[in-house]
């Protein structure tokens, strides 16, 4: 798995929806790289014997390429289908595809949206937990990395606008890591 991120500056500049799309594409691109999912490239996925699973080619169900792949005994494999489920009503990933800021994603995902997806799909719920744990660890690490950040209590509030956090912003101003578009002061 991968957790994509957008910086506070990117979110302020682009808006949250577009920044979420770019962050998701960064994660998808990282997963594809780690799995070796690149058209025409040698797969980094290995067979049990340790040898390469073969070249990656584009295969379509019912097409001649797909049929010939089945006859190659693993020397060439069909390009996997990548799918994604987003928790909520908006597909912010597809909107960010092929934009200037988005990373190269040669296998675009077919995106499905599901309101309250974390309540209906274990994969969505798991992804939500992984994202939140990653964010919480990042906030604790940031809080411990610089004594200047202690007043904001990120290790405890994880960046949410608690009373103590808002008081610290009012007294000390936002840090370079704060999203100024939220106007918390």
Regions found by a protein language model. Give the residues of each.
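RNase H-like, Mg2+-dependent phosphodiesterase core
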Residues: 1-40, 44-58, 67-185
């Amino acid at each position: 798995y991968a957790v994509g991120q957008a910086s506070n500056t990117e979110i302020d500049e682009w808006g949250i929806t577009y920044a979420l799309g770019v962050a998701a594409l960064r994660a998808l691109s990282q997963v594809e790289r780690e799995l070796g999912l690149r058209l025409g490239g040698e797969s980094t996925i290995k067979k049990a014997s340790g040898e390469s699973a073969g070249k990656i080619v584009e295969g379509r169900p019912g097409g001649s390429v797909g049929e010939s792949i089945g006859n190659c005994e693993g020397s060439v494999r069909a390009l996997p289908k990548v799918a994604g489920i987003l928790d909520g009503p908006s597909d912010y990933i597809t909107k960010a595809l092929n934009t200037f800021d988005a990373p190269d994603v040669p296998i675009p995902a077919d995106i499905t949206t599901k309101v309250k997806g974390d309540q209906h799909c274990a994969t969505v719920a798991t992804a939500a937990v992984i994202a939140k744990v990653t964010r919480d660890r990042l906030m604790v690490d940031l809080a411990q990395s610089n004594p200047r950040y202690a007043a904001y209590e990120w290790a405890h509030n994880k960046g949410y606008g608690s009373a103590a956090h808002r008081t610290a912003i009012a007294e000390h101003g936002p840090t370079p890591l704060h999203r100024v578009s939220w106007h918390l002061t």
